[in-house]
């Protein structure tokens, strides 16, 4: 049995007072405790004092208040039962029942009875002996609270309890409880356990319920079955083993809820709601292998590929999304149209997500044989939708690819082309996109846009000419800068001629005729020393 560690230390309970707040379980406190309730939570507070004897002594004079309720509607029996393995004891529970404590009183927290409270905590502060004792003294095993939850459901009503209550379930079923009883929401115990089988390590409980005639095909009020919820959460609170068990016991793999959702669509819909792990793909592959089909979903009759595209909103999961599409394309037709006439490519091009792997996914769809020229009910192709979507237009390569494979001048029901829609949303930063669209031969139908395109072409020309002029100016500036640096070098021709002029004026002929100055003399083309002096003097006149 799991060792329960108390949240409260008994020394913190303090002296009794009706208006004081005291804990009545591991996660609840309130006022209006009776003295009996206070004695129950303090039964083991002092190891040198027998707390049970104090309770016995108190009941001799105060038996008529045994069923008193505190601020939250809890009785002394509820407190003792839920804590019979911790602050209180099984013998105190038995004493209270013998003295007339009513096991069927409801508290103010969802009308819970003592049996439900003890059953939901049997692996913690309560125990199985307490359950048996309560039933023996007349606790109603078929009681349901305001939510229609019975004690059987309460074994798993806490979805995050990290323990398995199979022992309690077996006990309750041995008393004749209906294994297929439902809550007000229509949830069976199998549905509840299937949803949390990973959290509670309770795949064995799923197997036990199925072996004992739990029906896996009972839908709840939304039409969702145990297989749907297990498949949806197979990457988090449930697991693939539960999905396999349900299918082994003839769960309908293609059962549809009221929204036409199936187990397959539930997995895909939840693909990005939970942290990704390999169970996403394993569950998908398994369901497809077992015969899951692409059933039109919802009012729009969406295909499974459309659901995958629509539900994806996290750009950081783009790699996983590409893998998902690749898997689905191996088994399902990309050219299926929804009730609006759209294909999965329409939904992709209309997706309002930037930094999305549009190019990779379009390539996958094209490889799978999608027709990019299919029109929806409004006569729009995927390219027309893309030209009306800023997020898509930010991806230049995606636009280029779509223009390449599409009939670029298709006209929709309003008489507009892809270029018309692009110009309706045109911004200067999309000039490069305009160039791509025009390159593939796009033209306008709308007369206003025809004039607009002419103006834009002029602006484009001026823009390019302006860029060329700026580049020319930069080149000229660089030439001037480099020329100055070159001219003032000691070894430059300019500096040598200046030096020769100085030597000539000072009649240092021996320094004029030297190996270092031969290139300068050769440049001047002098035929003798007098001609050289003349040409040096003449040349230096023009050096600034």
Curated annotation (Swiss-Prot):
Keywords annotated in UniProt: ANK repeat, Repeat
Gene3D superfamilies: Ankyrin repeat-containing domain (1.25.40.20)
Residue ranges of ANK repeats: 31-71, 72-105, 110-143, 147-181, 185-218, 222-255, 259-297, 300-339, 340-374, 378-413, 414-447
Top-rank taxon: Viruses
Entry's transmembrane regions: none
InterPro entries in alphabetical order: Ankyrin_rpt, Ankyrin_rpt-contain_sf, Multifunctional_regulatory
Protein name: Putative ankyrin repeat protein L289
Species: Acanthamoeba polyphaga mimivirus (APMV)
Lineage of source species: Viruses, Varidnaviria, Bamfordvirae, Nucleocytoviricota, Megaviricetes
């Amino acid at each position: 049995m799991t060792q329960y560690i108390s949240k409260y230390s008994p020394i913190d309970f303090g002296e009794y007072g009706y208006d004081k707040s005291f804990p009545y379980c591991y996660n609840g406190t309130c006022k209006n405790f009776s003295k009996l309730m206070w004695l129950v939570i303090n039964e083991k507070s002092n190891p040198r004092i027998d707390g049970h004897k104090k309770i016995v002594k108190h009941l001799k004079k105060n038996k008529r208040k045994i069923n008193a309720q505190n601020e939250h509607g809890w009785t002394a029996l509820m407190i003792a039962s839920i804590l019979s393995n911790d602050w209180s004891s099984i013998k105190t529970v038995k004493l209270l029942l013998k003295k007339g404590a009513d096991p069927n009183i409801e508290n103010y927290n969802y009308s819970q009875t003592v049996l439900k409270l003890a059953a939901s905590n049997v692996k913690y502060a309560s125990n199985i002996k307490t359950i048996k004792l309560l039933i023996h003294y007349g606790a109603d095993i078929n009681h349901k609270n305001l939510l229609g939850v019975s004690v059987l459901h309460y074994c798993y009503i806490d979805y995050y309890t990290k323990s398995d209550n199979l022992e309690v379930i077996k006990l309750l079923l041995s008393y004749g409880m209906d294994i297929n009883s439902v809550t007000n929401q229509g949830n069976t115990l199998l549905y509840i356990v299937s949803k949390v089988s990973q959290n509670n390590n309770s795949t064995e409980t799923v197997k036990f319920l199925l072996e004992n005639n739990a029906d896996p095909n009972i839908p709840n009020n939304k039409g969702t079955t145990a297989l749907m919820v297990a498949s949806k959460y197979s990457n988090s609170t449930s697991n693939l083993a539960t999905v396999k068990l349900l299918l082994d016991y003839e769960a309908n793999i293609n059962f549809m809820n009221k929204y036409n959702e199936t187990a397959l669509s539930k997995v895909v819909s939840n693909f990005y709601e939970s942290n990704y792990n390999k169970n996403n793909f394993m569950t998908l592959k398994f369901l497809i292998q077992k015969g899951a089909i692409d059933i039109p979903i919802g009012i729009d009759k969406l295909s499974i590929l459309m659901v995958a595209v629509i539900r994806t909103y996290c750009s950081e999961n783009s790699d996983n999304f590409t893998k998902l599409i690749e898997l689905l394309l191996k088994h399902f037709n990309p050219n299926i149209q929804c009730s609006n006439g759209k294909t999965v490519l329409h939904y992709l091009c209309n997706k309002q997500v930037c930094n999305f792997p549009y190019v990779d996914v379009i390539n996958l769809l094209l490889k799978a044989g999608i027709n990019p020229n299919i029109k929806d009910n409004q006569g729009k192709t995927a390219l027309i939708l893309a030209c009306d979507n800023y997020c898509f237009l930010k991806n230049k390569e995606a636009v280029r690819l779509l223009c390449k494979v599409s009939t670029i001048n298709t006209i929709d029901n309003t008489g507009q082309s892809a270029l018309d829609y692009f110009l309706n949303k045109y911004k200067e930063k999309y000039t490069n996109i305009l160039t791509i669209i025009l390159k593939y031969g796009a033209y306008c139908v709308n007369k206003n846009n025809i004039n607009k395109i002419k103006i834009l072409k002029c602006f484009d020309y001026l823009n390019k000419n302006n860029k060329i002029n700026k580049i020319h100016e930069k080149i000229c500036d660089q030439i001037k800068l480099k020329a100055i640096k070159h001219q003032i070098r000691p070894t430059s021709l300019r500096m040598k001629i200046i030096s020769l002029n100085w030597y000539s004026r000072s009649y240092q002929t021996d320094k004029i005729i030297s190996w270092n100055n031969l290139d300068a003399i050769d440049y001047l083309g002098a035929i003798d020393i007098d001609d050289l002096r003349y040409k040096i003097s003449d040349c230096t006149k023009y050096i600034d």
